[in-house]
Amino acid sequence: MTLRDIRQEEFANLYINSNRKNILNLCPRFGKIRTSIKIFEKIKPRTILIAYPDKKIEESWKDDFKELNFDSSIVTFVSHISLKKHTDKNYDIIIIDEIHLLSEAQIEICKEIFKNNNQILGLTGTLSKWTEKTLNKELDLFVIAEYSIEKAIEEGVIVDYEIRVIKVPLDNKLPQTFRNKVRSEKKQFDALSYVIDKLEKEEKNTMFLRLNRMRVIQNSIAKLNKTKELLKEFKEERVLVFCGVTKIADRLEIPSFHSKSSEKDLFHQFAIGKGNHMAVVKL
C-alpha cells in the first residue's frame, strides 16, 4: 500500500466517522474520486448521485469506476446545471464534485436537495476561505479534511514543480460590454472590487461578486495578448495552456481542447507528441 493509498483511506474514514455532511478539500492529482470510492465500499450505498461541473469530470469518475471494478449501475450522474431535476429525489449519498464552482442558483437548489438526503460529500481541491465560509453558511457543510499541494509534495505523493508568476496589468483602454455597462476590463474589475470591499465591511456575502470578478480575469484581453506573446517566445517548445474559459482557449490561435471541441482526439494526439502548443479548459 502506497502513502497515497494510506492518506485516501484516512480521509475516507474521517468522512465516515463524521456526521456525513461535509467537504473534503484535497489537492489536485491526489485522488478525490478514489477516496470517494473507498467511502462507497465501506458504507455500501444502494443509490448514489454525483454532480459534476463538466463532462470531463464525469468521464474521470467512469474511468476510475471501471479501473477499480466498482458497480456504477447504482450511480446517477448529473451536471451542476441540471441539479434542479433532483430536488424531490432521495439517494443514499450525494457527491457534489468541484463544489466550489456552484453558482448562487445552484446553491439554492442544493438547499432543497439536502432537505431530503442525509449523506452529503462535497469535493474540492481549490477552495478559497470566502467560498468555504459561504458553503458553511448557506449549506451547513464544513471542511473536515485538508490536504494541500505543499503537504502532498513534502510526502512525495505528487511530483514537485516550479511556478513562475508573470503579472499582467488589466487592459484599461479597450471598451467591453459587461451586462449593461461599457467599460474597460480594468474599470470593471475596480468597480466590482469597490462593491466587494464595501460589503465586506458590512459583513455581507461577497462570494458571487468575487466569482464575477474572477470571470473578468479569466476573460482578460490583456492576459490573452500576453499569452500569445509567450507562445511566440516558446514557439519551438512544447506548451500546454490551461484556460479558465473556452472563449479564450479558442482565441489563442493554437489547437484547443475542451467540452465543446468537435475533434475529441486532439488532446490524445498532442499527448503522444503531435504539435507544440495546445490550449485546454478544465482538463
Each language-model region and where it sits:
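Conserved helicase ATPase core of P-loop NTP-dependent helicases/translocases
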Residues: 59-63, 238-242, 247-283
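Walker A/P-loop
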Residues: 19-39
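Inter-Walker segment of RecA-like/P-loop motor cores
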Residues: 51-90
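Interdomain linker/hinge connecting the two RecA-like lobes of the SF2 helicase core
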Residues: 20-23, 145, 149-238, 243-244
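Conserved RecA-like ASCE ATPase "motif II neighborhood" in helicase/translocase motors
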Residues: 74-112, 281-283
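P-loop (Walker A) phosphate-binding loop of NTP-binding proteins
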Residues: 27-28, 53, 244
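Conserved pre-motif I regulatory segment
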Residues: 1-24
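Post-DEXD/H (motif II) to motif III coupling segment of the RecA-like Helicase ATP-binding lobe
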Residues: 101-162
